[in-house]
């Protein structure tokens, strides 16, 4: 069974693929099966993924308010996906902000650029303080 961290990795991958224009319905099913994400974990993955997409405008507004000199479109696609997932979980789920931020930092270390960890930490921490 996949861990919640592996689920979040998959959500970031799906958000990235969606932004790159992949045919998502077929891709997501194949991708999740390949990652052995099934049953409750698949449901959790799709809940997070669809939650981000359904609330994308609100999430992007929250992110824009805390990006400082950056614009969301100037940030790398992987980092943007991590930020969107983190902001969604902080704003729309009952998961503790500290857990969400820690997971986002782990994802940034694994998937993002070298400088993204501190940036993602700062943005999500600022959002958590407003929420």
Curated annotation (Swiss-Prot):
Bridged cysteine pairs (disulfide): none
Function: Involved in transcription antitermination. Required for transcription of ribosomal RNA (rRNA) genes. Binds specifically to the boxA antiterminator sequence of the ribosomal RNA (rrn) operons.
GO biological process: DNA-templated transcription termination; transcription antitermination
GO molecular function: RNA binding
CDD domains in UniProt: Terminator_NusB
Species of provenance: Campylobacter fetus subsp. fetus (strain 82-40)
Family: Belongs to the NusB family.
Lineage: Bacteria, Pseudomonadati, Campylobacterota, Epsilonproteobacteria, Campylobacterales
SUPFAM superfamilies tied to this protein: NusB-like (SSF48013)
Gene Ontology annotations for the cellular component aspect, listed alphabetically: cytosol
Protein name according to UniProt: Transcription antitermination protein NusB
Keyword Ribonucleoprotein belongs to the record: no
Gene that produces this protein: nusB
């Amino acid at each position: 069974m996949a861990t919640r961290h592996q689920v979040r990795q998959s959500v970031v991958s799906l958000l990235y693929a969606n932004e790159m224009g992949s045919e998502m319905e077929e891709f997501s099913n194949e991708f999740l099966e390949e990652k052995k994400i099934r049953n409750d974990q698949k449901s959790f993955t799709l809940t997070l993924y669809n939650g981000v997409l359904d609330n994308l405008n609100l999430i992007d507004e929250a992110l824009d308010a805390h990006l400082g000199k950056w614009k969301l479109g100037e940030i790398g696609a992987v980092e943007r996906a991590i930020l969107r997932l983190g902001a969604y979980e902080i704003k729309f789920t009952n998961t503790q902000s500290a857990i969400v931020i820690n997971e986002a930092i782990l994802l940034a270390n694994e998937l993002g650029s070298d400088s993204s960890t501190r940036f993602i930490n700062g943005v999500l921490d600022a959002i958590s303080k407003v929420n």
